[in-house]
Amino acid sequence: MTKHLLSIMLVAVCVTACTISYKFNGASIDYNTTKTITINDFPIRAALVYPPLATTFNETLKDAYTRQTRLSLVNSGGDLTLEGEITGYNLTPQAVTEDAYASQTRLTVTVRVRYVDSKNPANDLDRTFSAYRDFPSSSMLTDVQDELITQISQELADLIFNATVGNW
């Protein structure tokens, strides 16, 4: 009886002492050492410029880190730092028909990202990310641009998050 009670108490102590945390976003951050992140605004350095892109992208990227992690966003000196620029904003014809007209147009946004992990420099990253959306050529870009930029910015933020702290 004493051995049985001792075994139960030992299991109870082990279960309460050990915790397993799994996040479906895949974030692999050691919150004991990494507490802050600095995300500098990404300016547009592309030949073709759509001014609302910078604001939409910057806010979406910051939201990705603040909503999916416990990191505090700071203006400078973060344990993690993200910076870069929007290097491409391109429209290309897709799905050319037999009469040599494109039935689809592709909007592609390219971003160069520099990621610095001051606690673990082996995680540092300097990489380019791209995302695109196709839309019917019969639509005016001005009619679909804002929605496409929102979707592309979200995809880019997810790609960057996964490449930096997502451990994917």
Where in this protein do the model-derived segments appear?
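Sec-dependent bacterial lipoprotein signal peptides
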Residues: 1-18
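A structural "domain/chain start" motif
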Residues: 17-59, 63, 70, 119, ...
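Compositionally biased, intrinsically disordered linkers/stalks adjacent to structured regions
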Residues: 145-168
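Surface-exposed short loop/turn segments
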Residues: 67-71, 79-124, 132-145, 154
